[in-house]
Amino acid sequence: MKTRYFILILAAFISLQGCSRKEDNFAYWAKEVNVSITDNSLRAQVTTTFKESCSYRIRYWENARGERCARTTSMQTGLKGENTCTLIFLYPETHYTFEIIVEDRAVSKRVEFLTGSLPPDVPSYSVDYSSTNDEPLTGYLLQWNANKPGYVTFCDYDGKVVWYQSFGEGIRTAHYNPHTGKLAVMAGFKYGVNDRNFQRLVSEVFVCDLYGHTFFRRKAAEGFLPHLHHEFKTTDDGKMLFVSNFIKAFDLRSRGASTESTDVWGDGFYLCSEDGKVEKSWDCFAELDPIATDYLDPVKTATDYIHANSVEIDSNGDYYMTFNRISELWKIDGNTGDVLYRLGVHGNVSLDGDFPSGGLHAAVALEPDLIMCYANGRDKGYSEGVVYKIDPVAKTATYRTRIVLPAEYSSKDRSNMQKIGDDLYFMNSTVCGKAIFVNGSGEIRRVISRSGISYRAYYFTM
């Protein structure tokens, strides 16, 4: 009897071993692998025909640099039949090798491919300056070009383009959310409004990923938020956040208007669902009455009253906006819409130093009431990267960080700033076309120049 049981156990073990050996063989799972470069020179489409459903990843690397620089895709769900996975962040005209790993056990033969050339209109980038203590970073810079055909790009720390996409029109702004993998893009100019406003209003918005899939595309027109400008981003839960003009008629004859009704183009924001339904809207007019606000001339500024340029939401669900004309940062209650404080010369917060002047852009909430901005300093002749710590109850604020840029790296308008390390910041100076890596003491580590205009730029570790 014991001998019989032993034989049965041995047979089962041999059977399992045989099954294991089969499943360790890539040919057990797949029968065909192909790779192609199609409509985008820096996207490689790997098509695998699986015999059985499975999970798989693709590991790939640049031949010249070897496997030490390999990237691996996220885990993919492979269904029986043909499956496609797209490889991204590739250099142009470069030889690569990849292998497919199925169920973390079976590995395919290695396959080589060659990427294509960049289209001639893709923006170019170059390193202008690198300090002696500069350490290479492995992330990528998101930048774009305001001219047609409207390319959004990622480049590496040396300015080499590794990703691009054309949107047909000049790119006004773009924002990538690494949590969702979504790219939010504003493109085109809104003609037919007036000479002042067409310069900032956009004609179309997109939400897409980095693999060529578009999830949302809509014209900025009646029926869908016709006056969008300056800022569009997706939140971590997939919603869409926009800066927009809000137009309201006022009787400004007491302020010098010649007619009874004047349209004032104020600003605010929209929060929308993934399919474009408005869930929340807010505008500035309850806080700033054009008739009563004496430090602004509402007749002269009617077509662009306070010029909002950014909107941000913090972890508590409250909002922050920057306004360029008045150089102010506002915090807005996410539930009531009340303005909780205003940091600026005409605001209600006292600051342990001079207030921002000559332009303020791109609020980033490092945490609630710890807000980073790019202070343009048109009246000073130099720009600053600033972080404010605001006490919303006492209405006081202090400078936590204040980085002064040299005049040649400053930008009198537009621009933005990021904190990308414990003591490392990225600053995009739009007017001079520079992407600047700098520490908290103002020591510049690297400067990358670009062709064309990129309203903002961002650094991401992928």
Question: Which role fits each region the language model picked out?
Answer:
Residues 81-86:
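Short S/T/G- and acidic-enriched coil/turn segments that sit immediately N-terminal to beta-strands
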Residues 16-36:
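Bacterial Sec-dependent N-terminal signal peptides
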Residues 44-50:
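Aromatic/hydrophobic beta-strand junction motif of beta-rich domains
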Residues 7-15:
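Bacterial N-terminal signal peptides
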Residues 87-95:
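Surface-exposed, short loops/turns at beta-strand junctions within beta-sandwich domains
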Residues 36-43, 95, 102-462:
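Histidine-/acidic-rich catalytic cores in large beta-rich domains
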Residues 50-55, 145-149:
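Short proline/glycine-enriched turn/loop motifs at strand-loop junctions of beta-rich domains
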Residues 55-73:
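Extracellular low-complexity, O-glycosylation-prone stalks/linkers
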